[in-house]
Every structure is written in C-alpha cells, then in structure tokens.
Amino acid sequence: MPSLKTLLRGVLVAAMLVAGSARAELNIEIIGGGASRHAISVLPFKDEGPTQGNLTPVIRNDLALSGAFRLIDPSAVANVPFEPADIRYPLWQAAGAQSLAIGKVESAGGGQIKISFRLMDASQRKQLTGGEFTVTPDRSRQVAHAIADMIYEAITGQKGFFNTRLAYVLKSGRSYALQISDVDGQRSQTILRSTEPIISPSWSPDGRHIAYVSFASQKPVVWVQDLATGQRRAVANFKGSNSAPAWSPDGSKLAVVLTTSGNSQIYIINAAGGPARRLMYNGGIDTEPAFSPDGSMVYFVSDRSGNPQIYRVPVNGGNAQRVTWEGAYNVSPKLSPDGKTLVYIRRSAGNFRVMSQDLATNDSRQLSDGSYSERPSFAPNGRMVLYSSDAGGQSVLYAATADGSSKVKLAVLNGDVQDPAWGPFNNP
C-alpha cells in the first residue's frame, strides 16, 4: 500500500505521466439520468437564426447535463408555439411534457437582438418564469446559459450553475496548458502554457483569480494569476516544495503545503503573499488542505494514524479531529457549499473512487465508476461534483449529480484533461 509520501510524490508529478495531444475545447457526452427528472421541451425560438445555433441547442444541452431534466423532442409534437396563446397543452401533456420553454428573437437595432423567453407549466397553463435580454448576437451563448439558469431555478428551487466556469489542465506532448471554459466545455481560453507541469488550479471565491502550482523554476511554486489582466505573482516560493493551494472563503488567505521544516505541513499565507503561519505541529505528513465554507475549519489529509485519512482542525490551530473512518486510504477532501457533505477519493481493491460523505451521519456513497478518479470538487450550488477519471486509456472529466444518479463526460478527442476545479457563482 503506497504511503502518503508516495501519494504526494504522485500528485506533484502526475502531470508528467499523461501523454497525448489535446484539442482546445471539450466534447460533452450525457451518460444516464435519474428516475425523477423533470420532463421539459425547449422549443425552437422564433427567428433564432442570428444566434447561429448558440441559443436553444445550448439551453437543451445545459438542462440535460444537469441530470435534473428529461428533454422531450419538440419535433415529436405537431405544435410549434412562440407565444403562450399558441400552445396546445393537451398535445404536450400527451407527450409527457411537464413544462415548455418558448421564445423569440427580434432585432433591437444598433446591431443588437432582443431574446425573449417564457417557461410555461403544461398542466397549470401558467408562466413559471421568463425574461428578455438585449445583446449583440455574439453574446447569445451567455444568454442561453442565463435562460437555462432561470429554468433550473424555477423547477428545482436551486440556483443554476450554467454561467459558471471550469478550470483544468490539458496535456499535449510535452506542453501543459491551464485552461478555463464554460461549464459545457465551450469558449475555452488558455491562461498559461508551459513545458513544465502545471497542477492544482484553485479558484478565488470571487472568480477573478486562480491559484496553481507551476514547476517552471524546476520546483513546485504556488502562483496566483489575475484572469482579467493575465498578471501573476508567486505567493509561495519558500525553500523546498510549495503546493496544494486552497482559498479561504473570504479570499484573503491561502492554505498551502510547504516542506520548509522537512515533512509536508500546512501553512496559512495572505493571498498577496508574505510570511507563512504553520497551522499544526505534527511529526507526520499533512497535505491537501480545504477550508470549510464558513472559514472556521481546515480539512486535510494526514498519515498520523498510519494510513492517509481526512481530518479537520480549527483555522487558528488546535486539536485535529478525524473525519473518515471507512476505508484505509482517503484523500483529496472538498466540502459542499453548505458544509454538510464531504467528497474525497477512496482507494479500495486497487481502485480510486469518488466518495460522498454526509458529515452529520457519516454515511457515504460512491459517485464514480472508473479505476482511477481524482480531484473532486462541487458545483457552486452543491448539486454536482466534478472530477477527472480514466476512460479507455484517456484522462477525461466527469460531472456527476451529488446523489450519483446521473453523470456527463467531458473529453478532448486525442488528449488528456486533468486537475479540474469548478468555479464560483461570481463569474466576472
């Protein structure tokens, strides 16, 4: 059984072990769905041609990838309404639709278009939500995500996450690229490219910065990069290894792992850099910190009990409390936004699987199926979990519903995607 020191070494060099070439954007594949999905039909919007396919197809894709909806094909019903008065409700009820999204696109002058939509309840025949957006045609995709967010919230009561972003690392030959994209894998942008490994991207709470680890100086150094300007600064470049950055909920601090004292230990630094405060004094290895949503606790991995397990400790120091008790190897903790659920990686029978644990009852369930999954993180509404996993010899991303009932796969055609992190609601 590998020790935690072996695990750490694997984390720091994992990016060097993945080969292949990568295309810029991720391709999405929906895999199954839960039994209690809401049946909805998103009809073609009137005159949506100027959006160049970036409106209703995007809305449908968003709703499908959430795992909360079952899409009814609008072409199966002999009714194409653009206004509520044109809806033939008995036909849609017979097709199994619980709600309908209808809309239209009009010229707004000055090179802009006005996109209007309504979400109608098929049984009560009333509007559930709706809105209007006046934008240039090249903003149609963002409007589609916003409409999907409104539909998601109207049906589930939870805030939608379709206008959030993902961060991940693409590996192509000897090149590493830190990228961000829409939640559906589109509109990808390269933030940093290097011939040395880039690992552990971590979003600031306001979504304006990303912390990550770069090996460009021949050792791991923690950097923070401004996404708007591209400017970056080294915030942890102490003697030895600097790794595993995690933001505090208010964005003022980072927890990092340093080896200045020998073994890997957790330190707290200001987000702008400066002196490091050691969180605990332990003879073993402590690593992979993650703040609780209220900022009062730091969850982490330690071998102090002999095998890697997850613990928590007050942010100002104190006695650590063990959190995971099932399994002999539990790593990579992340907390749900409400602080009630922990996701992590458990090794069992040689497989590395994403687990979800209720912190009140300690009940756990398995979310992933592959033999090697890593780096789980929650969507900002807590309803989905993003992680990387193996699929046919390729490293890809999966997003699973928090109850494990549905998942989607995001992959490049001929490359590897690794170290994912789901961004916050505050999308600049």
Swiss-Prot record:
One GO term describing the cellular component: periplasmic space
Cross-referenced InterPro entries: 6-blade_b-propeller_TolB-like, PD40, Tol-Pal_TolB, TolB_N
Record's signal peptide: 1-24
Keyword Cell cycle assigned: yes
Keyword Transferase among UniProt keywords: no
Superkingdom of origin: Bacteria
Main localization, broad class: periplasm
Keywords assigned: Cell cycle, Cell division, Periplasm, Signal
Compartments where located: Periplasm
Its job: Part of the Tol-Pal system, which plays a role in outer membrane invagination during cell division and is important for maintaining outer membrane integrity.
PANTHER family: PROTEIN TOLB, PROTEIN TOLB HOMOLOG
Subunit structure: The Tol-Pal system is composed of five core proteins: the inner membrane proteins TolA, TolQ and TolR, the periplasmic protein TolB and the outer membrane protein Pal. They form a network linking the inner and outer membranes and the peptidoglycan layer.
Family: Belongs to the TolB family.
NCBIfam families per UniProt: propeller_TolB (TIGR02800)
Protein name from the UniProt record: Tol-Pal system protein TolB
